[in-house]
């Protein structure tokens, strides 16, 4: 009896210690992982080919009665994409001659129109000019990469050779602005090379800023979901229960590279806005303001003497030569003589729309503005409201950004410091702090 009592006490103590750790730990160890699958670990897959066509945002009110009906409706519009690129870090000996190695990876995509255009993620077709597209009936077609946008992680291919327009069924795009948290969603793709895999979940949240390690900028207005998506799902559709694409699965937060309940999709409105220009021009110019900043904290409100319910985005830094600098926006500064810190401007509204966090500004610019458009900024400066107008420029290349811009970043809400994690083979690592610069 005495041993049992001691044993029970030890178990109780362990549970108490674990509970305290869970309640007090505020660090979430995560890594942003693209969902591209190296073909060396892919299972054998037997993909099918489409049969209809439409593109652009759908406003259909007809509802599909069941998940099997949704899958049957769209399965012929979802494809597997196989891309092969040279690997300069690998040398193989073939017939006694050293040659650069090649790596092959698998991703997903879906039919955009009956002209044979396929949309997928940029990271699925990065570094290649051609790829193979396999439908669920097993038919494989060669396709040329006709457009890429690393900033939004979008890529467009076009099937070459003969194909039947009647059999290429485009997937209708829903209006992602109308999506609500809690809605049921369906993900279809080729996780681990298992073609035509369907998983379900809900919209966990919308309007997320998704850090993009390839560019240093963020993907705006991303949809968060708990539908299971894994390596190989990259570029596949996230669907509503009508069988319309509300987004494109692109990444997960995970410490292992495997699904852990938090996935992200590029919204369908971004696809609808960009893809026609990617087909036409091969690239897309993102509008850019050139600031970094963050939500006003209660401590700052108290220190500056603002009303307790004050809302807005405080500017941390302004990029030299940016539209923000030309418009006269001021960031956080420090007096070299006495070391005093001067608070930056506080943006309270853009084009008359109130803003509460940097996400609001970035999402508005990305969804509503184009390069060359003017944007009106309502700014609180030294206790007074001023109106400034900025003319948006094309977003610069990452390499041309100053180091201060790359470093002056904020963490995603609710996440503690992101530690350095070992890189998972085949997947890019997440920068320590995700960028929040429009």
Label every PLM stretch briefly:
Residues 3-7, 24-311, 320, 358, ...:
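Serine-dependent protease modules
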Residues 9-22:
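Hydrophobic membrane-insertion alpha-helices, especially the h-region
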Residues 118-119, 324-359:
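Conserved PDZ fold ligand-binding element
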Residues 140, 385-387:
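A structural signal for beta-strand boundary/capping segments at domain termini and interdomain linkers
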């Amino acid at each position: 009896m005495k041993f049992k009592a001691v044993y029970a006490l030890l178990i109780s103590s362990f549970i108490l210690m674990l509970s305290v750790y869970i309640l007090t730990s505020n660090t979430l160890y995560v890594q942003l992982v693209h969902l591209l699958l190296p073909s060396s670990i892919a299972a054998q897959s037997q993909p099918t080919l489409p049969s209809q066509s439409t593109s652009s945002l759908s406003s259909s009110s007809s509802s599909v009665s069941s998940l099997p009906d949704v899958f049957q409706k769209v399965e012929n519009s979802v494809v597997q994409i196989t891309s092969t690129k040279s690997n300069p870090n690998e040398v193989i000996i073939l017939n006694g001659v050293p040659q650069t190695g090649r790596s092959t990876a698998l991703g997903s995509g879906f039919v955009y129109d009956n002209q044979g255009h396929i949309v997928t993620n940029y990271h699925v077709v990065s570094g290649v000019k051609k790829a193979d597209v396999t439908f669920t009936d097993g038919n494989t077609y060669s396709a040329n990469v006709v457009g890429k946008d690393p900033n939004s992680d979008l890529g467009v291919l076009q099937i070459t050779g003969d194909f039947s327009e009647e059999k290429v069924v485009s997937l209708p795009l829903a209006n992602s602005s109308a999506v609500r948290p809690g809605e049921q969603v369906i993900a279809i793709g080729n996780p681990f090379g298992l073609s035509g895999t369907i998983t379900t979940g809900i919209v966990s949240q919308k309007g997320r800023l998704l850090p993009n390690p390839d560019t240093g900028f963020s993907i705006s207005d991303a949809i968060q979901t708990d539908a299971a998506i894994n390596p190989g799902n990259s570029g596949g559709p996230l669907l509503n229960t009508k069988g319309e694409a509300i987004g494109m699965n692109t990444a997960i937060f995970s410490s292992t590279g495997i699904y852990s309940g938090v996935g992200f999709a590029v919204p369908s409105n971004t696809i609808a806005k960009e893809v026609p220009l990617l087909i036409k021009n091969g690239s897309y110019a993102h509008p850019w303001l050139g600031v970094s900043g963050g939500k006003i904290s209660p401590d700052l409100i108290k220190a500056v003497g603002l009303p307790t319910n004050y809302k807005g985005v405080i500017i941390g830094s302004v990029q030299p030569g940016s539209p923000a600098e030309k418009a006269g926006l001021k960031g956080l500064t420090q007096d070299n003589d006495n070391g005093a810190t001067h608070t930056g401007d506080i943006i309270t509204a853009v084009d008359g729309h109130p803003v509460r966090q940097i996400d609001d500004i970035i999402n508005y610019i990305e969804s509503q503005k184009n390069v060359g458009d003017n944007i009106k900024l309502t700014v609180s400066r030294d206790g007074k409201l001023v109106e400034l107008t900025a003319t948006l420029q094309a977003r610069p290349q990452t390499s041309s950004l100053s180091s201060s811009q790359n470093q002056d970043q904020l963490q995603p809400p609710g996440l503690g410091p992101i530690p350095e994690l070992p890189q998972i083979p085949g997947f890019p690592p997440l920068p320590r702090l995700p960028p929040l610069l429009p």
